């Protein structure tokens, strides 16, 4: 799992210089990840002329990178798909980008493959998962699909602490998708 910051915490006491350095390193990490996400999803001249970048994505790597660009430009939030300011969570960004239905499902698979196991405090209880499955069945939904979406929501709301970490997760997922030919 990626640490929240590449700068380690001091062993004892409060080291103000180390805290400032860690904060600056995190800001730089966020800026690098944001710039990389924007650059990866920037359409080429040919794509702009043919408007290919506006068509639904048929490759999961393209879909994921477009979602990362949405997060990099509109902003990232927690707890809701899209907030009042227009910022998106991971699932909200995936929904905001046009993609074929099968592509969206494959994108979820690649994002889950890029995720690390959540910390114990972020894992829902067995009773909660049973209730989630029962509610999904009552609404005619596939419980396994609901759980997959739930895993991504947990990573967005609890597991990832910064926009840089979220964008790096999406870039890892896009790289996994590309290596799989998707």
Task: Show where each model-derived region lies.
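Extended, charge-enriched "interface" segments that sit outside catalytic cores
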Residues: 93
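Domain-length accessory/inserted modules outside core catalytic folds
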Residues: 1-87, 96-182
């Amino acid at each position: 799992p990626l640490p929240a910051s590449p700068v380690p915490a001091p062993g004892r006491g409060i080291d103000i210089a180390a805290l400032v350095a860690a904060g600056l390193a995190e800001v730089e990490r966020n800026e690098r990840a944001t710039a990389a996400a924007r650059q990866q999803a920037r359409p080429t001249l040919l794509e702009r002329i043919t408007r290919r970048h506006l068509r639904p994505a048929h490759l999961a790597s393209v879909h994921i990178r477009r979602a990362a660009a949405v997060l990099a430009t509109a902003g990232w939030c927690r707890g809701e798909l899209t907030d009042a300011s227009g910022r998106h969570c991971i699932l909200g960004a995936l929904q905001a980008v046009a993609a074929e239905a099968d592509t969206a499902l494959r994108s979820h698979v690649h994002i889950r493959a890029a995720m690390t196991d959540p910390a114990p405090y972020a894992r829902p209880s067995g009773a909660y998962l049973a209730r989630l499955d029962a509610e999904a069945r009552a609404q005619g939904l596939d419980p396994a699909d609901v759980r997959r979406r739930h895993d991504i929501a947990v990573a967005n709301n609890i597991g990832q602490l910064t926009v840089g970490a979220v964008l790096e997760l999406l870039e890892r997922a896009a790289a996994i998708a590309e290596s799989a030919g998707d």
